[in-house]
Amino acid sequence: MKGITLTAPKRLRGVIEVPGDKSISHRSVLFNAIATGSAHITHFLPGADCLSTVACIRALGVTVEQPAERELIVHGVGLGGLREPADVLDCGNSGTTLRLLAGLLAGHPFFSVLTGDASLRSRPQRRIVVPLRAMGAQIDGRDDGDRAPLAIRGNRLRGGHYELSIASAQVKSALLLAALNAEQPLTLTGRIDSRDHTERMLAAMGLEITVTADQITIQPPSEATAPTALSLRVPGDPSSAAFWWVAAAIHPDAELVTPGVCLNPTRIGAIEVLQAMGADLTVMNERLEGSEPVGDVVVRSSSLRGTTIAGTLIPRLIDEIPVLAVAAACASGETVIRDAQELRAKETDRIATVAAGLSAMGAVVEPTADGMVIVGQPGQLQGTTLNSFHDHRLAMAWAIAAMVARGETTILEPAAAAVSYPEFWQTLAMVQEAA
């Protein structure tokens, strides 16, 4: 699918079961691979990134069955059971796969090489390599370890204390996984305020991990505290649901429902921002499923106003910023996004690509070093041709913008959406047909 052309529909209606959460899907496979016993995982996200994790785990000697598209059975091999891979581990386009595996493999006594596609090989890895080396890991890579391929010669690691300088769940998780093969406890301080699925899942698997407001400490597992398999239903991904929340909020005649979405406090920044912008957004039927809070989110047509997105909000909605920028372009007044320099290290430089795309649609957008300023105006977007640059979040953000744009919007390389949302285009058609 080289390109898709969209026009704004008269109405949007539907109940949308969004795909399983991408972060939790990755972790359910990685963590259960080193657990004792077998785990049954349902509502797994069968997107390209998560399937890269499955392929790498299989290459490390773990049996992973897939009885249905969204269902896995992972037969754990225990903490010391991974075996040296016979070939290079290809992480595809998945930064989560590469970074979490780097942490996990750094403490295993064998040689491995992690690589990926051209986009992943261009993304910075020093953020994990430097702290892992401080724990005693032997990791080499291009540009002194800042670019994949990464060659890892695993060995016994040190624990101790490390202060995180950026709020990144991938960095935090890589270090916590490395600590499972460390000789002492590991304590993390600093920017620990990123999504906490790793901490929740490891605790649910029986590991001794203590989390406070300003630090995380994990103890090296003993026989008594070795991880045990954790079966789970993966909740809906709030980063995927956010596309529908914004679509409903900016469209003049819309009501969309996303049931069973993960409402982890570290992931609901987009809900808080949309509510601050005046969105008609209701959270219902809140409950706990496994180690994660979930609920149903209903959004109706709204009159949005500009807001500020910055500070501790950023790590709680970093993946939703492209579509929140679309919401800002359709709101009344100015929206300021700052402290989001992490966007420049994503699949594309999302500050540059989002600003350029919205500007091409007629929005007033000024990119900055760590974000952008958007002067919103309802009804200002004009259809045009936009490139996803193979970035899944861009492809879907442009589709949502097209729902309110005048004229036709053509999106190039729309198949990129399959990385995190394989059914996105079918669902988009459904909510227009149901109207």
Curated annotation (Swiss-Prot):
Catalytic reactions of this protein: 3-phosphoshikimate + phosphoenolpyruvate = 5-O-(1-carboxyvinyl)-3-phosphoshikimate + phosphate
Record protein name field = 3-phosphoshikimate 1-carboxyvinyltransferase
One Pfam family in the UniProt entry: EPSP_synthase
Predominant place of localization: cytoplasm
List residues binding 3-phosphoshikimate: K22, S23, R27, S168, Q170, D319, K346
The Gene Ontology CC terms held by the record are: cytoplasm
What processes in GO biological process is this protein linked to? amino acid biosynthetic process; aromatic amino acid family biosynthetic process; chorismate biosynthetic process
Q: What pathway annotation does it carry?
A: Metabolic intermediate biosynthesis; chorismate biosynthesis; chorismate from D-erythrose 4-phosphate and phosphoenolpyruvate: step 6/7
Enzyme's top EC category:
transferase
User: Could you tell me where this protein is found in the cell?
Assistant: Cytoplasm
Q: How does it assemble?
A: Monomer.
* Source organism per UniProt: Chloroflexus aurantiacus (strain ATCC 29366 / DSM 635 / J-10-fl)
Zinc keyword on record: no
